[in-house]
Swiss-Prot record:
GO cellular component terms listed in the entry, alphabetical order: cytosol
CDD domains in UniProt: YihA_EngB (cd01876)
The protein, known as: Probable GTP-binding protein EngB
Record bears the keyword Cell division: yes
Gene Ontology biological process terms, A to Z: division septum assembly
Keywords: Cell cycle, Cell division, GTP-binding, Magnesium, Metal-binding, Nucleotide-binding, Septation
PANTHER family according to UniProt: ENGB-TYPE G DOMAIN-CONTAINING PROTEIN, MSS1/TRME-RELATED GTP-BINDING PROTEIN
Domain of life: Bacteria
Length: 194
């Protein structure tokens, strides 16, 4: 998709704050500091629309980015971040679960994992949660440019096995540096919009 117009419409914490629109939505889920903001910025060809932070746990709301008046990316808080209180993490969990299980406009979830590392228990639980609720999901393994190409398949296999990955789902190696995987991710999104 050729992207020229992007707007952060709202940062929401409750359903009544969600945009009132019929546009399809794609949520981005992943551990804190896994590269969600870099993924968004690469997909929409912007350097800093989604703020990139060295400090994990920066996103604390559901951030609705309207793209080309055609769809929304919804950046959700990163899971598995230890430096926020347990109460805060539980609030985020409820907020994310409420959105994913009740939002009619949600067409799919882009689950972001780091190709360099074995997925965590939180990654596995998120994938399992999405499968349980029959939510279309694509797993995007980011930071492929940070490891030698010779390790891509080995690391991808570890990610798939750890998640108990469904071969019917889409799995994409991604790099915000080289833009590898960008077209495949857009293809998943376009298919869900048809």
């Amino acid at each position: 998709m050729d992207v020229n117009n992007v707007e952060l419409v709202i940062s929401a914490v409750r359903p009544e704050q969600y945009p009132e629109t019929d546009l399809p939505e794609y949520a981005l889920a992943g551990r804190s500091n896994v590269g969600k903001s870099s993924f968004i910025n690469t997909m929409i060809r912007r350097k800093s629309m989604a703020r990139i932070s060295q400090k994990p746990g920066k996103t604390q709301t559901l951030n609705f980015y309207k793209i080309e008046e055609a769809l929304f990316f919804v950046d959700v808080p990163g899971y598995g971040f230890a430096k926020v209180s347990k109460t805060e993490r539980e609030k985020w969990g409820v907020m994310i679960e409420t959105y994913i299980t009740s939002r009619e406009q949600l067409r799919g979830v882009i689950q972001i994992v780091d190709l360099r590392h074995k997925p965590t228990e939180d990654d596995r639980m998120m994938y399992e949660f999405l499968k349980y609720y029959d939510i279309p999901v694509i797993v995007v393994a980011t930071k492929a440019d940070k490891i030698p190409r010779s390790k891509w398949q080995k690391n991808a296999k570890i990610v798939r096995e750890t998640l108990d990955f469904d071969p019917d789902d889409k799995f994409v190696l991604f790099s915000s540096e080289t833009k590898m995987g960008k077209d495949e991710a857009w293809q998943f999104i376009k298919e869900g919009m048809e």
